[in-house]
Amino acid sequence: MVVYLRPETNGIQTESVLFRVFKDPTWHSKVDLVYLANVPGAFLTDRGVVERHYSPRIRFARQGAAAFTPAMRDTFSRFFGVPFDKARVVGAYEALGLLGLDEEALFRIWVPVYDLIDIEGQLVKRVSDNLFVVNYDIPALMTKHHADSDVAAMVFRTELSYEEFRPAVDQIRSSLVKEGLLDPDKPEHRVFHWSRGPWEQLLDAHGYVYTVRDEPVDLADLAFGRFLLDKGETEQTILAALNDPFSSGRNLFTATLFDTFEGAYARFRAV
């Protein structure tokens, strides 16, 4: 399980909350910390790690409506009750100019829950009667990743499934709120990210877990990576899937959230 703290919340207070939770008797015998590193922002920036990690979401933030697949357009129309072709759907970067806002102001636009949807991992927010912004959070997120911002990355070894690990995440969230490190009405991903599926776990590890030689960890050293290799996949086919999760028309990462290794592999091979 890969966990990393976002640059704006990375610090000893947040780390302490996580460590306290995993020392709790409920989790102490079930979850082992096997990797901890503070990855320098300059290291990530020089290698284009963040851009690659978020490349699908950045593409939608730049292209807006043009990036939507037919299935995504149908989901949009059903949810918002507006024909996709009649709606003004723009990427976040175009929205900055249209609305005259900076990155943080765009990110902080509040809307009711019925004006916000996650479609294949892309966040769509209705900000006015017929203006919809795709991945409104990406410009702000990218500005927070710079040479002077670090990311704390952790790998936990566990036999718990993703669903079984979720209560630990809920406990961390409650502790963060109690410590004043997270607003009660905000989700935990404002502070930290955790891998919620096998393919997402590979993506996270490939971006934020490194060897002592400052090289990405080998796929064979990751549980799901080893599983795929044992199934006959090659490093090339695995990396191709990580780099282009929409090759099947669906987002491989979101399609396999909370999946088992076998289930995630079956979805990948069903393409």
Regions found by a protein language model. Give the residues of each.
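Non-catalytic terminal and connector segments of soluble metabolic enzymes
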Residues: 1-271
